[in-house]
């Protein structure tokens, strides 16, 4: 994607590990930001 070389898709074995590492951090982060943002609007 960064280097325009469509003949070698095999040069991305790290893509799955990188996707997994990004999403294991990004998914709970988005969840907690959404939960904290929702708590701002809850009046007791």
From Swiss-Prot:
A biological process term (GO) from this entry: photosynthetic electron transport chain
Pfam families recorded: Cytochrom_B559
Keywords of the record: Electron transport, Heme, Iron, Membrane, Metal-binding, Photosynthesis, Photosystem II, Thylakoid, Transmembrane, Transmembrane helix, Transport
Main location: membrane
First and last residue of the signal peptide: none
Top-level taxon in the UniProt lineage: Bacteria
Residues the entry annotates as binding heme: 23
Function (record text): This b-type cytochrome is tightly associated with the reaction center of photosystem II (PSII). PSII is a light-driven water:plastoquinone oxidoreductase that uses light energy to abstract electrons from H(2)O, generating O(2) and a proton gradient subsequently used for ATP formation. It consists of a core antenna complex that captures photons, and an electron transfer chain that converts photonic excitation into a charge separation.
Complexes and interactors: Heterodimer of an alpha subunit and a beta subunit. PSII is composed of 1 copy each of membrane proteins PsbA, PsbB, PsbC, PsbD, PsbE, PsbF, PsbH, PsbI, PsbJ, PsbK, PsbL, PsbM, PsbT, PsbX, PsbY, PsbZ, Psb30/Ycf12, peripheral proteins PsbO, CyanoQ (PsbQ), PsbU, PsbV and a large number of cofactors. It forms dimeric complexes.
Protein name, as recorded: Cytochrome b559 subunit beta
Organism: Microcystis aeruginosa (strain NIES-843 / IAM M-2473)
